[in-house]
Curated annotation (Swiss-Prot):
Substrate binds at residues 21, 54, 74, 84-85, 167, 200, 218-219, 228-229. It holds the Pfam family DAP_epimerase. The record marks 169, 218 as: Could be important to modulate the pK values of the two catalytic cysteine residues. Belongs to the diaminopimelate epimerase family. One of its GO terms (cellular component) is cytosol. It catalyses: (2S,6S)-2,6-diaminopimelate = meso-2,6-diaminopimelate. Its EC number is 5.1.1.7. Pathway: Amino-acid biosynthesis; L-lysine biosynthesis via DAP pathway; DL-2,6-diaminopimelate from LL-2,6-diaminopimelate: step 1/1. This is Diaminopimelate epimerase.
Length: 284
């Protein structure tokens, strides 16, 4: 048995989740960890690996202006720009491992830096920056109304809204999320050639100006229990179109978030829980 592990690398990790959106978190600050997409896929397998929606790497900051660097990989091994639920778990990991004693930290990402503020032991507030409604090349889309776009599917044109929260989102307003064909439409839109890097697709049911329900198809993954950046994107669309107030409770399959946005020219905030499940190690 000892010979089996002789040429393998031991990796310590934590299993965490935010509203059942689950993560494998690895501390890479003192020990550089390189994982290929093939290895990440194997680790993400819920039957033969650890099992997770995303892998989060905690890295040393490359700048004096930020405290840490935050990297995110989907279960298929692709590195992505943003994960809101992951950001809260990233912050809790830093606290639990004694890597910071600050009440507020600034972390760098593949795109824009994020501010993480610790409100209570497991309730965390993240500054997700200002939503970007102008990041798409819209030449291939028909502008139906202000920030309403028509995407041609197999049998119909679907009205949606496009916004970036550091990663791309397509928001569809529905009367009820209960019977929404999340995986069918989500997969169809994600594979549309107008989104060469894919897109996260969310179905939003507005209950009132302070409360929405949301189901999310995450690119390269499928429907997930929760997606923090999707909650931010949906609320941003609702506020921009004056359908929602500046503080909104978002009900996802995995739990609830609070999203706060005062409007254009200001940052958007996400408030929600993070949970540590267990620590472990694996040989690869």
């Amino acid at each position: 048995m000892d010979s089996y592990y002789k040429n393998k690398k031991k990796i310590n990790f934590s299993k965490m989740h935010g509203l059942k959106n689950d993560f494998m978190v690895i501390n890479c600050i003192k020990k550089n960890v390189f994982l290929t997409s093939h290895i990440i896929k194997k680790l993400s397998n819920r039957y033969t690996g650890i099992g997770f929606d995303q892998l989060l790497l905690v890295e040393k900051s490359n700048s004096l202006l930020t405290d840490f660097h935050y990297r995110i990989f989907n279960a298929n091994g692709n590195e992505v720009e943003q994960c809101g639920n992951g950001a809260r778990c990233f912050g809790l990991f830093l606290l639990l491992k004694g890597l910071t004693n600050k009440k507020k930290i600034l972390i760098s990402t593949k795109k824009k830096p994020l501010t993480i503020e610790f409100l209570t032991e497991n309730m965390i507030k993240v500054n997700m920056n200002e939503p970007d409604f102008k990041f798409y090349n819209l030449s291939s889309l028909q502008n139906v109304l202000d920030n309403n776009f028509s995407i041609k599917l197999i049998n119909e044109n679907l009205i949606c809204n496009l916004v970036s929260i550091g990663n791309p989102h397509c928001i569809i307003k529905v009367q009820s999320i209960k019977n929404a064909p999340v995986n069918i439409i989500g997969d169809n839109i994600e594979k549309n050639p107008i989104f060469p890097e894919g897109v996260n697709v969310s179905f939003m049911e507005i209950l009132n100006k302070k409360h929405i329900k949301l189901r999310v198809y995450e690119r390269n993954v499928g429907e997930t229990k929760a997606c923090g950046s999707a909650a931010c994107a949906a609320v941003a669309v609702g506020i921009a179109q004056k359908l929602l107030s500046d503080t909104v409770h978002v009900e996802l399959l995995g739990g609830k978030l609070i999203i706060i946005w005062k409007g254009f020219g200001t940052p958007l905030y996400m408030v929600g829980p993070a949970k540590h499940v267990y620590d472990g190690y694996i040989y690869i």
